[in-house]
Amino acid sequence: MSTVNVQIGLHELLNGSNAQIQLSVPQLVEKVLMRNEGKLTSTGAVSASTGKYTGRSPKDKFIVKEPSVANKIAWGPVNQPISEERFNKLYTKVLEYLKEKEELFVFKGFAGADRNYRLPIQVVNEYAWHNLFVHQLFIRPTEEELANHNAPFTIVSAPNFKADPAVDGTNSEAFIIVSFEKRIVLIGGTEYAGEMKKSIFSIMNFLLPEQDILSMHCSANVGEEGDVALFFGLSGTGKTTLSADPHRKLIGDDEHGWSDNGVFNIEGGCYAKCINLSHEKEPQIFDAIKFGSVLENVIVDDKTRIADYSDTALTENTRAAYPIDAIDNIVLPSVAGHPNTIIFLTADASGVLPPISKLSKEQAMYHFLSGYTSKLAGTERGVTSPQATFSTCFGSPFLPLDASRYAEMLGEKIEKHDAKVFLVNTGWTGGEYGVGKRMNLAYTRAMVQAALNGELDKVETVKHDIFGLDVPLHVPSVPDEVLMPEQTWADQAAYKQKAIELANQFKENFKKFDNVSKDIINLGGPTA
C-alpha cells in the first residue's frame, strides 16, 4: 500500500458521515455520558476506566521498518521493527472496522508550542473520552490555524479492535505502530489513553533532533527574572512537587524541546498522577480537575460522585488530564529562553548519593545517559526491596534514536548556554531504605532554591571520593552535616561499601553505551 493509498483511505474515513470533527469540550462530555463511556464527578470532570490495560504496553510498540528510517532508528526491545506489509494489512483492517462505527471523533491540533517547530497532528478516535483526552492534552488550534492545518501526523485509535498475533505479527491483541513515512500511528487493543500522548512524544523524539532540537522528558518553569529551569527525573523522584513553585511559572510538566531559540513545551496540557492526591499536598493539580478534565482509573463514589484518590483498586497509575491553562501560574504560549539551571532528580534508596551536587558537562552527560533512580517495594509486582533502575535520558521507552545523540546535544547546549547542572537526591539519608529516612522535603526545596538563585555558583565544594561529584559545604537553611551523606551514617565502613556497590551498578549499566566519548566515562562517571 503506497503512501497515496494510505492517505486516500484516511480521507474517506475523515469524510464519512460518522466522523465528528473538532467537537467542543461540552459536546464531547455529552457524548461520553450518552455513550456510557464514563461518569461525571462532583467537580465536573469525566471519569473513565481503561479496562485491563492500566498503563503503557512497551512490548506492543513497533516502528515500521521503512527505507527512510531503517538506518536511523536504534532497533531493539524498545524500538521493535515491523514490516511495511504487516502494517499495511493491519491498517486496512482497522480502517474497515472504524468505517462501520456509528460515530468517530476527530481532533486536529499541534505538538510543539514554538510555531517554528510545531507538528500538525490529528487524532481519529473510536471513543469520545479519548478524543476529550487528546483535546485537553495537545495544543488546541485557533480557527485560523485550523484552516491552515496541513500534512498532519495522524493517530488512528481503535481500542476495541484486537489484533491476532499469528496473523498480524504483533505480540498480543494490543498494538502501537508508528509509520514515519506514512505519518500514521496505529493503536488498537488497548484503552489506555497515555499511549496516544507517548506516541506523539516518541515521534517528536525522532523529528526534533533532525532539526537540531533536543527533545526532553522533563518539567520546566521560569522565574520572575526570566531564568529557566529544567527538572529531569523518573517516577517518584519529586519532579512534579519540586517544579510547582509559587514564585515560578510553569512552562510544562512533562515534555519539552530545546532549540536555538530556547525551551518550548511539546504539549498543551498535563497528565498528572493522582495517587493520594490532596488539596493540601498539590493544590494546583487538585484544583485543575474540573469540567472538561479527564480522570483515568480513579475510583468514584456511585452516589456522591466524589473521587477517592487513595483507592488503588484498579491501579496505582491513576491519572488526570487537563489543559495547561487550568493552572493559574503558567506561561502562555508555553515558550521561554535557554535554561540557566538543570536539575536531575534521583530517589536513591541506597542512601549514598549526596542530597545535592554540582555536575561538570561530562558528569551531566553521564548522569543523563544513566537516568538513575530506585524502584521501591509496591510500585511494581515482584519488587519487595528497592532496586536500582536506569532509564536512559530519563525516558528510555520513548527514544527512537541512539541515546548518545541526545546526550551529545545536551552537552553541546550546556556548554553553549553555560547552564548549571545539579544532581539532587530526594531519596534516603542516614542509611539505606529500611535503616535511614527519606530526605526532608523542606531541605530539598531549600537546596533547589539555592541552585535556582545562583547561591551555589561560588560556594566551596568538596569532591565525593567515590562518585567524583562536587558537593557544596554549605547551603542556606540546610544543616551542613546533611550535605555529606557519609556523616549521616552511623557506620562509615557500611556507607563506603554501599557507595562502591552503587558505583559498580552505574559502571555495569554504562557498558551498553559502547559508542560514547571516553571523556564521558573518564570524567563523568564514578572515580572509585
Swiss-Prot record:
Reactions catalysed = oxaloacetate + ATP = phosphoenolpyruvate + ADP + CO2
Query: Which residues are involved in binding substrate?
Result: R56, Y192, K198, R319
Pfam family, any one: PEPCK_ATP
List where in the cell it is found.
Cytoplasm
Q: Which GO terms describe its biological process?
A: gluconeogenesis
Q: Does the keyword NAD apply?
A: no
Instruction: Sum up the protein's function in the record's words.
Output: Involved in the gluconeogenesis. Catalyzes the conversion of oxaloacetate (OAA) to phosphoenolpyruvate (PEP) through direct phosphoryl transfer between the nucleoside triphosphate and OAA.
Q: What is this protein called?
A: Phosphoenolpyruvate carboxykinase (ATP)
Give the species: Bacillus cytotoxicus (strain DSM 22905 / CIP 110041 / 391-98 / NVH 391-98)
